[in-house]
Swiss-Prot record:
EC number: 3.4.24.-
List of catalytic residues: 162
Location within or outside the cell: Secreted
UniProt cofactor(s): Zn(2+)
Organism: Tityus fasciolatus
Residues reported to bind Zn(2+): 161, 165, 171
Name of the protein in its database record: Venom metalloproteinase antarease-like TfasMP_A
Broad class of the protein's primary localization: secreted
Modulation of this protein's activity: Inhibited by EDTA.
């Protein structure tokens, strides 16, 4: 029997990396996040497992061009999310080696903020994460970004929310035109106010995905191109 396993490769920017005393402390922290992501994915009831393949913690000397070249000095230092996701996607499109090549999804975790640049050089910090729609099995579109503000629930939600964009779901209340996958059912039938993870989260439903999100992800998984997410079941 086949199992659905979404594999992740995590890279961290220098601002995030320097919060930790050691690489092992950072890796442990990220691993704990994935326990939370798995718990949220379980609410899709599609049997999706998440697996962390590895973590690369960049420091100020090793940060790649897609981070350095797009940093807005602020203060505080921040990114324009649209510019960052485009540059990151292109970078990994051109650097398909090792874990970056083998993984289903690549996420940057940043401790810097994201938002709209203002004319005075500062940034209106208003974006927790961004990801390419239905990009999971496309080598040049399998990227996402999540900001980490040290609140466990917030960052786990962001990672799960952005992952599900990559797995073919729009926000609740959005139609199929918001999904980069032909034939997607979209999520227009699930209003944002119902309060699920892909809507405006309320206390009742903020740790669950809506029925529409489930249908959208199920649709993506039914496509032949999604076969890379399926593997032989082991004692996973």
């Amino acid at each position: 029997d086949d199992c659905i396993v979404v594999e992740y490769y995590i890279v961290t920017d220098s601002a995030f990396t320097k919060r930790f005393k050691s690489n092992s402390a950072l890796t442990k922290y990220v691993t704990v996040m994935f326990t939370g992501v798995q718990n949220l994915m379980d609410t899709l009831e599609l049997g999706i497992g998440v697996r962390l393949l590895g973590v690369t913690a960049f420091n100020e000397e090793t940060e790649p061009s897609f981070i350095i070249d797009n940093l807005i000095s602020g203060p505080p230092e921040a990114f324009d999310p649209d510019v960052l996701i485009t540059a990151m996607s292109e970078y990994y499109c051109n650097h398909q080696i090792g874990l970056a090549k083998n993984t289903d999804l690549i996420f940057l975790i940043t401790a810097r903020g994201m938002g709209d640049p203002r004319e005075d050089g500062t940034v209106d910090i208003n974006t927790a994460g961004i990801a390419n729609s239905a990009g999971v099995y496309k080598p040049c579109l399998k990227a996402g970004v999540a900001t980490d503000d040290s609140d466990y629930n917030e960052r786990v939600d962001t990672l799960a929310h952005e992952s599900v964009h990559l797995l073919g779901s729009p926000h609740d209340g959005e139609g199929p035109d918001q999904v980069s996958l032909e034939g997607s059912p979209g999520a227009a039938n699930c209003p944002a106010k119902a309060g699920y993870i892909m809507g405006n989260r309320n206390d009742k439903n903020k740790y669950k995905f809506s029925p529409c999100t489930k249908k959208c992800v199920e649709y993506l998984l039914s496509k032949p191109a999604a076969s890379c997410i399926f593997e032989q079941c082991s004692g996973f």
